[in-house]
Amino acid sequence: MNEIRSMTVLPAVRTDVSFVTADGLTLVGELALPEHGEPVGTLLFLHPLPTAGGFMDSHIIRKAANRLPALANIAVLRFNFRGVTSPRGTSDGAFGHGVDERLDFEAALRFIRERGLPNPWVVGWSFGTEVALNHATEHDVAGLILLSPPLHRTSVEALERWNLNDVPIVAVVPEFDDYLPPAQARERFAVVPRLEIIEVEDGKHLWVGETQTTRVLSEIVAKVNPAALPLPTEFV
């Protein structure tokens, strides 16, 4: 047996993908599928702030793609928002301040639908949570998972729109978050009574370290495929 570490890449069917937004931009990404059988669910990752170095390889997103198809039978779609570069390539366009990224999210969700991938959960991290909260309300998604939500670009009105549907929403909030620690998160999110807040003891905004990584991935799997828990820490 081998211990799962930061750079571990478990077996999956990985494909470089691209899709086009409604305003004509080509975005680049990767789709990772379970090696055998159909996935039980799909994660659509929305990455952290591009102007602060966020991209499709931000470590939690990369590790989810590297592990969860094998460990939890989950498909993972990750991509670069407009104007963002990673080793996969550069998406067309320029940073849209969380506004134009609506079209990026919609193009990614459309790609999931066209591929027939099941049960799409939107997973935003930091800036990605703002894109999800502001732009996913009118779309048919299985749920939202918000990692380290800062609520910098999300108004009370945008939050209240989530009361018009019954989509499950969970916010995974680190105890020592730099922008929205748990007490403030409970206050800000109170306008959406069904929203579940999970406070992660000793957690920080960037979820650095294997302990925090495993906790975050476990909270995601708990919503999408709880039968896969606990996540293995070793592989053959």
Please give the residue ranges for each predicted region.
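Serine-hydrolase catalytic machinery in alpha/beta-hydrolase-like enzymes
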Residues: 20, 25-33, 38-115
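An N-terminal hydrophobic leader/cap segment in hydrolases
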Residues: 1-21, 25-36, 127, 233-236
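Catalytic histidine-centered segment of alpha/beta-hydrolase-like enzymes
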Residues: 203-215
